[in-house]
Regions:
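Short, amphipathic alpha-helical interaction segments positioned at domain boundaries
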Residues: 74-115, 185-202
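Short amphipathic alpha-helical interface segments
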Residues: 1-45, 99-150
């Protein structure tokens, strides 16, 4: 088992599926994308299981969208002609794990925000920890994010930071249930579960 496989096994708690998924992620991390045919060549009979697990953990997302670019609007189809992409932060996670054997979200978020020229990039691991602590079932509101920014003295405007978190692949708008958004009283976001090794609060 190579370094990336070991890191994924610890995250997914499933060593068997981690092996073909690691091979797919390693290949896709070079360009950020992978085609259905390429996944088939790498995984063989495990194709569907790998794609479902990759999508569930937001490690590998379908490029085809139904309405918006939100994760919940991505159409996962297992057939020729389809393609899949890695959220930006997952590329950092995969490339680091391939060298270190460790799945390191804190390191990845600091690195990606440093690349994005975020002046407070060193505070991003603290923000990620706050997101994980405050989220329920991997969901967080814009109001909560604003409160976190105040607590850790982030200088950026909340709406700008939210746009950057979405671009980085840390989270995506939760648009499917208007009732949920109405109850929250603020825009609702789904966090990328692959960034959190602890199980979420319900």
């Amino acid at each position: 088992m190579d370094k990336l496989e070991k890191a994924l096994s610890a995250l997914l708690e499933d060593a068997e599926v981690a092996v073909p998924l690691a091979a797919v992620l390693a290949y896709a991390s070079k360009t950020g994308r992978i085609s259905y045919n390429e996944v088939t060549e790498i995984t063989g009979d495990n194709l569907e299981e790998v794609l479902l697990l990759g999508n569930k953990w937001r490690l590998l997302l379908p490029t085809k969208v139904e309405k918006s670019g939100a994760w919940e609007d991505r159409l996962l189809l297992c057939k020729p002609g389809e393609s899949y992409e890695l959220p930006n932060i997952v590329r950092y996670l995969v490339q680091n794990a391939s060298k270190t054997e460790h799945w390191a979200p804190m390191r990845a978020i600091a690195e990606i925000f440093k690349e994005m020229d975020e002046p407070d990039w060193q505070k991003m691991p603290e923000l990620l920890a706050e997101l994980g602590e405050s989220a329920r079932n991997y969901q967080i509101t814009a109001t909560q994010i604003g409160q976190m920014c105040s607590r850790i003295s982030l200088r950026k405007k909340v709406d700008v930071l939210i746009a950057e978190l979405k671009a980085a692949g840390v989270m995506s708008p939760k648009l499917g249930s208007l009732a949920e958004v109405s109850r929250a009283g603020s825009p609702l976001y789904q966090l990328n579960p692959s960034l959190f090794t602890k199980k979420p609060r319900k």
